[in-house]
Amino acid sequence: MIKALFQIFGVIGVVLLLGCSDNSGSGNSDSLVNPESDETKSQRMRELLSDSVSYMYELSLIRGHLWVAKRLSMTGFLDHAAMHAKHPEDEIYSDLVEVFKAKGLRGFALELSAFSNSVVSGDQKAIEQDYRVLVDSVQVSQDLVELTTGELLELINRLISQAAREYAVGIIDGQVDNVHEYQDARGFIEIAMNLTRNHEQQSDLSENHLAVIGLLKGSLEGLLEMWPTLVPLGEVPFDASRLFGAAADVEILSLSL
């Protein structure tokens, strides 16, 4: 029945986009235009401390950028990789510094800087090593949080929605207009898949929740064809509307929990 519900409502995904979760996360370009007031920063910190989904969303954005940086560096696209390696340090991590302190965590600023420097240097052995250390450090910050299936779906909805916005900027009429945004979107879907697979391994999930997670995993895997390569040279015959629809489908899936 859940599968049927998913298939029936998938076609109205774009219409339901307006119902998707509002995201004020660091992936939005608006935050680069309007400097945050002290009160806004204080509210943001309270949100990240009290809302597990918002906290995990920020960490997931970082993980997405880092995954792309690692992939690009391993295939020789060091200039592209360096941009993604620096992005979390420059634009996202600062939101989390005080949150980590409040949670009693050391964070991963040193590891983030080391990985970024390794990417710039082009030393593949150092890149591999520093990436593993960095991912392990990020995982320590994630391990404090255990999401319910409903919270996971909300998080995945946010990640797909952000990927859709980035893809819409990156690919216009089948042509690459901003390869960096296109690459960002791929990283966010990768982390969404990773989170979904990890959640599926929980031993206490009900049959209903396992069915929902299975459908979610299949949907995410189906999206991967939208990135035939991380640095496309020709046409990319896909459109962001597919991602917007996938985000809406996740909302519909959550109704069956």
Regions found by a protein language model. Give the residues of each.
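Hydrophobic helical h-region of N-terminal Sec-dependent signal peptides
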Residues: 10-14
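C-terminal motif of bacterial Sec signal peptides marking the signal peptidase cleavage site
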Residues: 16-19
